[in-house]
Design a protein with these regions (language model features):
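Asp-box/WD-like beta-propeller blade repeats and closely related beta-sheet repeat scaffolds
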Residues: 184-201, 208-219, 223-249
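Short coil/turn segments that connect the beta-strands within blades of beta-propeller domains
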Residues: 111-113, 161-162, 202-204, 254-255, ...
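Repeated scaffold domains used in trafficking and secretory/extracellular systems
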Residues: 100-106, 151-161, 192-201, 242-250, ...
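Surface-exposed loop and turn segments in beta-propeller and other repeat-based domains
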Residues: 189, 224-245, 289-296, 326, ...
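Short, conserved, GDST-rich strand-edge loop motifs in beta-rich repeat architectures
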Residues: 116-131, 259-274, 347-366
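Loop/turn-rich, solvent-exposed surfaces of beta-rich toroidal or solenoidal domains
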Residues: 297-321, 325-369
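Hydrophobic, well-ordered beta-alpha structural blocks that scaffold small-molecule cofactor pockets
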Residues: 1-105
Length: 399
């Protein structure tokens, strides 16, 4: 502001007893006058500065003044100024103090439809039971309405052209749905404990991850016929113990598949949490997976966003936009990640293993739901799903 108004007189628009004192600490010169539309303030003084009606601005040469908006109802003021030939940035701006307020207003008034997959059981004798039960939910931010679109216990969900595919954990089926969330088909899975799914459009293949067998399978998206299968290592077979790596979620970019897991060495059940993400080359599918991210604690939700591999270090509640940038940190078990071009969405589940985080955090949040998160400012808003327990995946249909 001081640079733009260097050779001009400063005028404040809006006699605000809140915003003017804050703004005056940032402006290096004393304002020439204040304008305000409220007739009760006409020709009065505020802090030694004359208050005049907005029409006063129309008699000024635009190049001689710089207007700083100091009213919370800035949208109407901006409209008035633009309609009268003033240019944003050149002739006027909002007070720098409005940055926080405007972000709050943006988040408060934001609307988005967020698809949430929930893996809760419907059987109240099961540990992962919740009152609402699992399913695919639509959370409409704005009116803040929750609707269950499909009943079930769902893990990862992916949009593949005009269809969606979702892994149903209890039925051991892959659901195929249209974009209205009508079930088109259910494909039998050849084993329990499938979790992750991704779609590679050039090959028209679905990539499925099994958390017990630690396998990555390729299926034709039209017929669901299996094309190939990679076993992450021979450790499960040799030891006759399942889920030693605990592969879970997956994403794909062109020829490369990225899969997250609890332990690269296969020792997480022994307390060795060397979790991470490995890259698998589809052109050399049975080659050795290449670890690209290490040192994570039960990670989930790898996603390619803006050309970078983003992921969640779930137990620590950390969100990374690449392996060097810790973009956000949350006080719960983070799983489920999406981006709509403006905000990130990070899912959070009730933490069944809170004692493992004692001493590592000052707060352990037990709510299920998701955050709307601005990575630049670290501002967030939490949208609770109080009758659910486990959020697995988040999807934004329209970006």
């Amino acid at each position: 502001v001081n640079s733009l108004a260097k050779d001009k007189r400063v005028v404040l628009y809006g006699r605000s007893e809140d915003w003017i004192p804050k703004s005056l600490t940032k402006i290096s010169k004393t304002p020439s006058y204040i304008v305000d539309r409220n007739p009760i303030y006409k020709n009065t003084d505020y802090r030694g500065i004359k208050v005049l009606p907005p029409e006063t601005l129309l008699d000024e040469k635009k190049e001689d003044i710089y207007i700083v908006i100091t009213s919370g109802v800035y949208e109407g003021i901006i409209t008035f100024l633009v309609e009268n030939g003033f240019t944003a940035g050149i002739n006027f701006c909002c007070s720098p103090e409005f940055r926080d307020y405007s972000l709050l207003e943006e988040i408060r008034n934001y609307e988005q439809e967020v698809i949430v997959s929930c893996s809760d059981y419907h059987d109240n004798t099961m540990t992962r039971y919740s009152r609402a039960g699992g399913g695919i939910y639509k959370y409409h931010i704005g009116p803040n309405e929750i609707e269950r679109l499909v009943k079930g216990s769902f893990r990862q969900i992916v949009l593949a052209g005009e269809y969606l595919y979702a892994v149903e954990f209890v039925e051991c089926k892959l659901y195929k749905l249209n974009t209205a969330f009508k079930v088109i088909a259910k494909y039998d899975l050849d084993a329990a404990n499938y979790c992750g799914i991704a779609y590679e459009p050039r090959r028209n293949i679905l990539i499925l991850v099994n958390a017990a067998r630690d396998t990555v399978s390729l299926h034709n998206a039209d017929s669901f016929e299996m094309v190939d299968r990679l076993v992450y290592s021979d450790k499960n077979l040799n030891d006759e113990v399942t889920s030693q790596h605990h592969l879970n979620d997956v994403c794909v970019c062109d020829d490369y598949v990225y899969v997250s897991y609890f332990s690269h060495s296969g020792n997480w059940k022994k307390g060795i949490h060397d979790g991470g993400i490995s890259e698998i080359n589809l052109r050399d599918f049975h080659g050795k997976p290449l670890p690209v991210v290490r040192g994570l604690w039960k990670p989930h939700s790898p996603q390619l966003i803006n050309g970078e591999l983003c992921y969640l270090d779930s137990m620590r509640g950390r969100f990374y936009t690449n392996d060097q940038v810790l973009a956000g940190e949350f006080h719960g078990f983070a799983r489920g990640l999406a981006f709509d071009g403006r905000f990130y969405y990070i899912g959070q589940s009730e933490d069944m293993y809170m004692s493992r985080r004692f001493g590592t955090t000052h707060n352990i949040m037990l709510n299920a739901g998701f955050y709307l998160f601005d990575a630049e400012t670290k501002a967030s808003r939490f949208y609770p799903m109080l009758d659910n327990m486990n959020i697995h995946d988040i999807l934004i249909m329209e970006q």
